[in-house]
């Protein structure tokens, strides 16, 4: 009698069919149940996975860069696939996107929004005007030369304005950064990052030459005051003699 592969397969199939009819409810072993119901991971990896998949941004748009970000909401780019849900309250957001020029009068409100966001929080500086002040950085007396002077920035996105594809790339890089964080590093970053508080009042700074001129004027005024005091004393002494 010659057995080929087909007859062996048919015999094994008949045995499996007989076993299924004999015992229709199979009981799986403990090892199979444990392997199918247990996930081995760390607390850092699990929390990072949950956070990077649900970044809720707060949109702080002040100029034309914000229009490019609004293009992501459409069906062409569909930023919902990255878990981005725009929020109108800073208390519900963990990401703030600054897009546009930031003036000194707007700086306290930006810092207040950043302080009201829960930890951990992230910042994306979008556009040349936000990063360096842009074309307003040379002659303007009321423009902040970079939003990183007010709040710590995690991702810099240059451009005037940057394209929606670049914004998606910045979000992907931020997701990679969030996925590699640990609790120790997060606490270290929070203590390292310092930013202006609400009580701080920004004032325009003067050049070095103007500061030197102001010091000379103050010193000349003090010298004139001392000379005038001496003359007054001399005149009083002369008057008392007569």
Swiss-Prot record:
Predominant location category: plastid
GO molecular function: 4 iron, 4 sulfur cluster binding; iron ion binding; NADH dehydrogenase (ubiquinone) activity; quinone binding
PROSITE patterns linked to this entry: COMPLEX1_20K
Top-level division of the source organism's lineage: Eukaryota
One GO CC annotation: respiratory chain complex I
Residues annotated for [4Fe-4S] cluster binding in this entry: 64-65, 129, 160
Cofactor binding mode and count: Binds 1 [4Fe-4S] cluster.
GO biological process annotation, one example: photosynthesis, light reaction
Cofactor: [4Fe-4S] cluster
Assembly and binders: NDH is composed of at least 16 different subunits, 5 of which are encoded in the nucleus.
Function: NDH shuttles electrons from NAD(P)H:plastoquinone, via FMN and iron-sulfur (Fe-S) centers, to quinones in the photosynthetic chain and possibly in a chloroplast respiratory chain. The immediate electron acceptor for the enzyme in this species is believed to be plastoquinone. Couples the redox reaction to proton translocation, and thus conserves the redox energy in a proton gradient.
Name of protein: NAD(P)H-quinone oxidoreductase subunit K, chloroplastic
Organism: Chaetosphaeridium globosum (Charophycean green alga)
